[in-house]
From Swiss-Prot:
Residues 49-51 are annotated as: Lacks the Ser-Xaa-Pro motif that is crucial for potent interaction with nAChR. This is Alpha-conotoxin-like Lt1.3. Alpha-conotoxins act on postsynaptic membranes, they bind to the nicotinic acetylcholine receptors (nAChR) and thus inhibit them. Has possibly a distinct nAChR binding mode from other alpha-conotoxins, due to a different three residue motif (lacks the Ser-Xaa-Pro motif). One of its GO terms (molecular function) is ion channel regulator activity. The keyword Acetylation does not apply. Keywords: Acetylcholine receptor inhibiting toxin, Disulfide bond, Ion channel impairing toxin, Neurotoxin, Postsynaptic neurotoxin, Secreted, Signal, Toxin. The keyword Transmembrane does not apply. Belongs to the conotoxin A superfamily. Expressed by the venom duct. GO terms for cellular component: extracellular region; host cell postsynaptic membrane. Residues 22-45 form a propeptide. Disulfide bonds join C47-C53, C48-C61. The cysteine framework is I (CC-C-C). Alpha4/7 pattern.
Length: 64
């Protein structure tokens, strides 16, 4: 193989690795975001049980 061919193969491998890595990272971020939202909802549930916190954050607590 010549130098050009080796350089082309190197660029192809780097590009492929970057694209695959980017797609996997994007998928994992959605999972992280969903988990983060669940934690946030759990924290609001605790806040909604506390009357002073509920009074200050009524937009996050369902009416009861």
């Amino acid at each position: 193989m010549g130098m050009r061919m080796m350089f082309t193969m190197f660029l192809l491998v780097v590009l492929t690795t970057t694209v695959v890595s980017f797609n996997l990272d994007r998928e994992s971020n959605h999972e992280n975001r969903r988990t983060s939202n669940q934690i946030t909802r759990g924290m609001w549930d605790e806040c909604c049980d506390d009357p002073p916190c509920r009074q200050n954050n009524m937009e996050h607590c369902p009416a009861s």
